Amino acid sequence: MCLIIVSGTSIPILLAQVTPAAKPAVTAPAAPVNVTPATALLSTQKLAIAGLSHDHVHNILGDYRDGKVIIVGIAEADKQLRDRYQKQYNLPDSILFDDLKKMIAAKKPEVVLGYNPVAKHIDIVEACAPLGISVMVEKPLAATLAQASRMEFLALKYYIKLLTNYETTWYPSYQHVYDVAAKDSLGQIRKIVVHDGHQGPKEIGCSKDFTNWLTDPELNGAGALNDFGCYGANLMTWLMNGQKPIAVTAIARHFKRQTYPKVEDDASIFVEYPTATGIIEASWNWPFSIKDLEVFGDEGYMHALDKDNVVTRINNNPAVTRIATPLTAPNDNPVSYLQLVTRNRLKGITDRSSLKYNMIVMQILDAAKRSIAEGKRIVL
């Protein structure tokens, strides 16, 4: 995990914008600016943002501009970056800070959302956990398993919620596949195949502030392996009900050395379970943007083609394509979900955003890196 908060590295797109009939006057610097909070807020929590270098921040700032969320503070050390976003989203001076700790002390947010380099997620938790402030970061949870373990320790010690956001968590098609599989309509799951990625972060126009760290092995933890491999690891953990794999084998390719000299741009990860096999294909070399999910059982097959469309085939019956039923709050967006979890109205312990599941994700990614480095199957 990771706000829509869209995870992956797609071109920033502002989603679910609302055009009101009239714009009421701003009543407070940090309040949403053009929709009545009583009818439009996705969350009543006082949210804060740590970092602006992740392009997915456009989604939460779009929600702020449209009056759907309350942002009380934004911490970003880069003044040029702060100024750019301030101008684009008409952000008041009163919510902008150059330091996370100063912002927390001044604004006392309920939750901090991380839009900084993955390797810096740990800094947010170090600052927030002792103060009892919950955190949600963009996927993956951390750059390394060691960082994730430290973050887990802090979250458990100080009783905060530490969540990871993935774009695919809010896909109706994926939830439909999960629901059908959970009813044993496909029989025993035997194979899970996940494709994630696009033509490459630079190729699709991600900002330089984003790609500077996304293509750095220290700041991102890897290249395409971390960026898109985490999706498959997360979905497999969810579909396998939190079961840890028994072994991981991976290979990495470097097709675009001139464009991405420091990191791999393609990875294939094979995840072994006692009764099933998972195949993760993560790449910055697809001919188009892709996020899909295939599940094969003893008695049936389902393929979530994209966010909405699902193909189902049971035994030898003809395949049927349908549009998945739209999700409803809090399962349709990360902000509403976040509020219910942090206020203990939704457990959030065994789902795709949970700390428990994302520690397993980090174990899979760590094993994949070791497999690549050592050229062998890694037994967990």
Regions picked out by a protein language model, each given a short descriptive name:
Residues M1-I13:
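Bacterial N-terminal signal peptides
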Residues V18-L41, V111-L113, V341-L380:
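C-terminal helix-rich "cap/oligomerization" subdomain common to oxidoreductases
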Residues P20-Y89:
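N-terminal Rossmann-like dinucleotide-binding module
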Residues A28-A31, G232-N309, S336-I349, A367:
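Contiguous beta-strand/loop segments that form the cofactor/metal-binding neighborhood of enzyme cores
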Residues I49, V137, L162-T164, A304:
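Hydrophobic residues in well-ordered beta-strands that form the structural core
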Residues Y89-L154:
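Beta-loop-alpha module in the N-terminal Rossmann-like domain of NAD(P)-dependent dehydrogenases
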Residues R150-T168, R190:
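Rossmann-fold dehydrogenase core element
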Residues T169-T259, G375:
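Predominantly a Rossmann-like dinucleotide-binding segment in NAD(P)-dependent oxidoreductases
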